[in-house]
From Swiss-Prot:
Alphabetical keyword list: ATP-binding, Chaperone, Metal-binding, Nucleotide-binding, Zinc
Molecular function in Gene Ontology: ATP binding; ATP hydrolysis activity; ATP-dependent protein folding chaperone; protein dimerization activity; unfolded protein binding; zinc ion binding
GO biological process terms, semicolon-separated: cell division; proteolysis involved in protein catabolic process
Protein name (record): ATP-dependent Clp protease ATP-binding subunit ClpX
Gene: clpX
Binding site for ATP: P119, T120, G121, S122, G123, K124, T125, L126
CC per GO annotation: HslUV protease complex
The ClpX-type ZB domain, residue ranges: 1-54
Keyword ATP-binding: yes
Similarity annotation: Belongs to the ClpX chaperone family.
Length: 417
């Protein structure tokens, strides 16, 4: 293909034939030239094909296997090995089920929505977000404490679907294969395990309202959010293939499990029940649907969340790993910020342990790590951009425990010359 215009000896684009004078940029290859306009057109075509691929949901042939899904989860979430395996298998089977439903005569497979149980800051939300990122599907989050049943002041359950629709850029097809994470689901348990005879606006009533969209229905979603009104146009979204992941700390559930697994003993003067002392996280691993019923969930709601995954409380070692090992680890993020100022940032091992211990003391789990770091780093991040000749900043445990200033290493005159 010609690279020059024979008449004017001008360089031309090998694809559209425009000369270098007609375009902003002409990029040379081994035997051809391509202009900026053709590059932009190619990018548009690739973007459109990518959107089309996402609209149909993950291709089962290209769907990561459970082992591969867990490997990627390991890059972002520390620990929780069993929960990751449960999630990887459940998500893989969910999208295989969608593929099977498109084939006539196939066995009808029930949807496997997921219930995550674990203390605050153990990684429930991060696991759900990472799953959506791996599968390249729209993702939305909702807080169960804000939900009310229809007719009461609060957020309608349909607004959860609206959030997913917004994440999918109002592409209904894409939204219908997305993932919704509902946090604080334990807060909508009714106050006792006996049926309610009065209105429970934020408890059993919300469970009933969530039932339909979780099991699969065509929801009428107001495109602008808020309350429905007769003059408003509705978007129809089928929730049959939306994967729902619900999460909560379930404080007090361990007591119900403890009572169930208590060992009865016989004999004069013996205890009626001998309690087996275990950590709450260890007890949650053995949770059963019956325990959830006693906690305050209605049978139909428990039945719609057949996959149970328990997360354990993070210890000091896990907290330190979270600070430095994941792809998006906080230490790496701060080091990148300092790198942009051409300054090396170093955390001593003692400082990482101090941060972890402070987070454990606050009982906020991994989510408390950032606020501790922000407080410790505020002054130095304020000063460094205005300083010259700074080579390295060292964060020691004294910075965390005693609010001392970080160690600043300056360049020598010889180095700066």
């Amino acid at each position: 293909m010609s690279r020059r215009d024979d008449r004017s000896d001008n360089l031309i684009c090998s694809f559209c034939g425009k000369s270098q004078e007609e375009v902003k940029k002409l990029i040379a290859g081994p035997t051809v030239y391509i202009c900026d306009e053709c590059i932009e057109l190619c990018n548009d075509i690739i973007a459109e094909e990518s959107k089309l691929e996402e609209a149909t949901g993950p291709d089962v042939k290209k769907l990561p296997k459970p082992l591969e899904i867990k490997d990627v989860l390991d890059e972002y979430v520390i620990g929780q090995k069993q929960a990751k395996k449960v999630l990887a298998v459940a998500v893989y089977n969910h999208y295989k089920r969608i593929e099977a439903m498109t084939k006539p005569g196939e066995v009808e497979m029930q949807k496997s929505n997921i219930l995550l149980l674990g203390p605050t800051g153990s990684g429930k939300t991060l696991l759900a977000q990472t799953l959506a990122r791996i599968l390249k599907v729209p993702f939305a989050m909702a807080d169960a404490t804000n939900l009310t049943e229809a007719g009461y002041v609060g957020e309608d359950v349909e607004n959860i679907i609206l959030n997913l629709l917004q994440a999918a850029d109002y592409d209904v097809e894409r939204a219908q294969k997305g993932i919704i994470y509902i946090d604080e689901i334990d807060k909508i348990a009714r106050k006792s395990d006996s049926p309610s005879i009065t209105r429970d606006v934020s408890g059993e009533g919300v469970q009933q309202a969530l039932l339909k969209i979780i099991e699969g229905t065509v929801a009428s979603v107001p495109p602008k959010g808020g309350r429905k009104h007769p003059q408003q146009e509705f978007l129809k979204v089928d929730t049959t293939n939306i994967l729902f992941i619900c999460g909560g700390a379930f404080a007090g559930l361990e007591n119900i499990i403890q009572q169930r697994i208590g060992v009865k003993t016989l004999g004069f003067g013996a205890d009626v029940k001998k309690k087996i002392e275990k950590k709450a996280g260890e007890l949650l691993i053995g949770v059963t649907p019956e325990d959830l019923l006693k906690f305050g969930f209605i049978p139909e709601f428990v039945g719609r969340l057949p996959v149970l995954a328990s997360l354990t409380e993070l210890d000091e070692e896990a907290m330190v790993q979270i600070l430095k090992e994941p792809k998006n680890a906080l230490v790496k993020q701060y080091q990148k910020l300092f790198d942009m100022e051409h300054v090396k940032l170093k955390f001593t091992d003692g400082s990482l342990v101090a941060i972890a211990r402070e987070a454990l003391k606050r009982k906020t789990g991994a989510r408390g790590l950032r606020s501790i770091l922000e407080n410790a780093m505020l002054d130095i991040m304020y000063e460094i951009p205005s300083q010259t000749m700074v080579k390295e900043v060292v964060i020691s445990e004294d910075v965390i425990y005693n609010k001392e200033k970080p160690i600043i290493v300056y360049e020598s005159v010889a180095e700066s010359a």
